[in-house]
Amino acid sequence: MSGERRLNGLSLKVGPLGEHDRLLTLLSDQEGVTRLAVPGARRPRSSLAAAVPLSLLELQVAGRRGLARVRQLKVLRSFNSVGKQLETLAAAQALAELSLMLVAGNDPLPGLLNTLLMHLERLEALSQAQPAQPNTTLACSVQACVHLLALGGYGLPVQECCRNGTALEPPLGQWEWRCSLMPEEGFAIGALPGAALQLNPSELALLQRLLRPALPMRRDGELMGPPEVWLRLLAVVECWIRTHLPHHMRALGMLREAIISSGDGRT
């Protein structure tokens, strides 16, 4: 059949399509976000029934006009274990949702798939942790959003003041110092009217460290920052996404509720 091709990618979203088929939304390095029909995937014992969310798939696809169809499917890796904990499930759904918002149709975003897979691997490990580590899950989620936003061209401008260009160098120990999040502009030095949020020096320093590959850890191996600080940084990310991207992210709200319900977040 004309237009046959092989695609490797992560299933971000799967929904019903007619009575027996599924609609698969795939993120790949080759094509960005692609929507594909998976014929018969809702039938019992279908060979294509493995088309489920958060799975790394190898697909044989036919057709280039209209809605292409999946002819063969192989699961390379499944991240369904993130569903063992509500916090890791909400976090994984949030990352999938954000990735969909960042990719403009069939325009690939270099590095996005690998970065998303890296953070899903971290969430997968946290989903199996005993006892549960909701604060670390929250921190991983905030950092993952920071990384994905930067790749998508919507990075948080945490290096200089948006009003005068002065370097944002938080004076640790000066607790009266404040930095204001101005949703349309970025971060400005001082407690300014119209700010969505204000951060103290340690909160800004923690946010700046999220640009690095690893989470910020203390010398004793424990995560830096208490739950209430990570919830504030989540609010920063939520505000930035709400202002600069076209859709509200429901999954981040679910994550916030799950963290607070776990008792590891205080308001």
UniProtKB/Swiss-Prot annotation:
It comes from the Bacteria. Keywords: DNA damage, DNA recombination, DNA repair. GO terms for cellular component: bacterial nucleoid. One of its GO terms (biological process) is double-strand break repair. Involved in DNA repair and RecF pathway recombination. HAMAP family: RecO (MF_00201). Belongs to the RecO family. This is DNA repair protein RecO. It comes from Prochlorococcus marinus (strain MIT 9303).
